[in-house]
From Swiss-Prot:
This is Shikimate kinase. Its main location: cytoplasm. Catalyzes the specific phosphorylation of the 3-hydroxyl group of shikimic acid using ATP as a cosubstrate. Its EC number is 2.7.1.71. Pathway: Metabolic intermediate biosynthesis; chorismate biosynthesis; chorismate from D-erythrose 4-phosphate and phosphoenolpyruvate: step 5/7. It catalyses: shikimate + ATP = 3-phosphoshikimate + ADP + H(+). Mg(2+) binds at S16. It comes from Mycobacterium marinum (strain ATCC BAA-535 / M). Keywords: Amino-acid biosynthesis, Aromatic amino acid biosynthesis, ATP-binding, Cytoplasm, Kinase, Magnesium, Metal-binding, Nucleotide-binding, Transferase. It is found in: Cytoplasm. Its cofactor is Mg(2+). Residues 163-184 are annotated as: Disordered. InterPro entries: P-loop_NTPase, Shikimate/glucono_kinase, Shikimate_kinase/TSH1, Shikimate_kinase_CS.
């Protein structure tokens, strides 16, 4: 059993929104690892960060991600920082990983009203967002098999693009039968 798609990206890139819509389009369930972490720990992510620190949060996160990769056959949405763990990056190998790309300006705009993102809390969120970008973008690119720009694209268009890539993730391969049954 393996997820149909694993979504990764910066805060505000659309992992939750796109995840819900993609799961619906595929007729499968969505598992958000941030929600699974909160359920398992019985505390919010912000509380885990405040009480136990980022290192302990990342340990719990890796455990949850590994279990989800083994047990979930729908769409899996990872927390924005999951890829910072070498163990998570290793576990993603061989899975269909969709990187939802976003610009700094759009990411700051989309996360503006949120108080549940511990690494963006406090003054100068734009600078913090840019720092996350410089740290994480190379990691997202390394683990992804599909990349999609979410800037100025509505969620429906993003999902349609992902669906087209899931149907044919490597367009330079020999033709194969498709669900549409189109004759060639």
């Amino acid at each position: 059993m393996a997820p149909k798609a694993v979504l990764v990206g910066l805060p505000g890139s659309g992992k939750s929104t796109i995840g819900r819509r993609l799961a619906k389009a595929l007729g499968v369930g969505l598992l958000d690892t941030d929600a699974a972490i909160e359920q398992q720990a019985g505390r919010s992510i912000a509380e885990i960060f405040a009480t136990d620190g980022e290192e302990e949060f990342r340990r719990i996160e890796e455990e949850v991600v590994r279990a989800a990769l083994a047990d979930h056959d729908g769409v899996l949405s990872l927390g924005g920082g999951a890829v910072t763990s070498p163990g998570v990056r290793s576990a993603l190998d061989g899975h269909t990983v969709v990187y939802l790309e976003i610009s700094a300006a759009e990411g700051v705009r989309r996360t503006g009203g949120s108080n549940v993102r511990p690494l963006l809390a406090g003054p100068d969120r734009a600078e913090k967002f840019r720092a996350l970008m410089s740290q994480r973008i190379p990691l997202y690119r390394r683990v992804s098999t599909i990349r999609v720009d979410t800037n100025r694209r509505n969620p429906g268009a993003v999902v349609r693009y992902i669906m087209s890539r899931l149907d044919d993730p490597t367009p330079n391969t020999s033709p194969s039968s498709t669900a549409s049954g189109a004759a060639t």
